[in-house]
Amino acid sequence: MTLRTPGRRAAVFGLAAGAAALACPPLAFAGAQKEEPLADSVRSAMSAAIGQSAPPPTLRFDNIDARLGYLRWLGAMSEKLKKRKSEGQERIEFLQTLWYESRRAGLEPALVLGLVQVESGFRKYAISVSGARGYMQVMPFWARQIGDGDAARLFLMQINLRFGCVILRHYLDVERGDLFMALGRYNGSRGQAAYPDAVLGARKQWSWTDASALPASAPASTAR
């Protein structure tokens, strides 16, 4: 199944994005991924990862504890995100989609949240001076390289998060798991510390430990 929306909707998204861009301050670390040649096998794999595009399914968990842990994470992250996204349903849908797309790409949700914070400040229609778009500041050339060529659709929440996660996963693979270098490549500043340090610092704000899943501490022994 391919990610498709009617052309009219894409035009509407483009107009909304343009208006939003005029109202937004410049983005300090906005992405500017550099277009590089892709091997046919890499292009095919990334296109396949992008193209498997049904909306996030009903989440399934191995057991009730895993589901309850996810719900606790969702509640905690929603509370943290409230100041940046005040509308409750939009906030929950964003977090559900980000969790799904992060896990699908083998990424830590806290890392992706940190990247979104640095890249766009959680603004759906953010546009950088280099033309990067949306939450994860995806460059338009990616729509041509691994998508259907319609860069306007990069403003759609799930599409933007999917592209961003697939691209970051690709850069991690290229850099053989070196997160520092992969983040620099994502931002077009490979080898420089400012951007990776900003994302890794932001990740700490979104890290979460499920206290309910921790083993209870042993009772203190009493002297006799």
Task: Label each residue range with its predicted role.
Residues 23-25:
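N-terminal signal peptide c-region/cleavage motif recognized by signal peptidases
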Residues 20-21, 50-52:
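Residue-level detector of alpha-helical hydrophobic segments embedded in or interacting with membranes
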Residues 29-39:
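Cleaved targeting-peptide boundary
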Residues 1-18:
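N-terminal secretory signal peptides and thylakoid transit peptides that target proteins
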Residues 39, 43, 71-74:
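Onset of an N-terminal alpha helix
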Residues 32, 53-224:
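Catalytic glycan-binding domains that act on GlcNAc-containing polysaccharides
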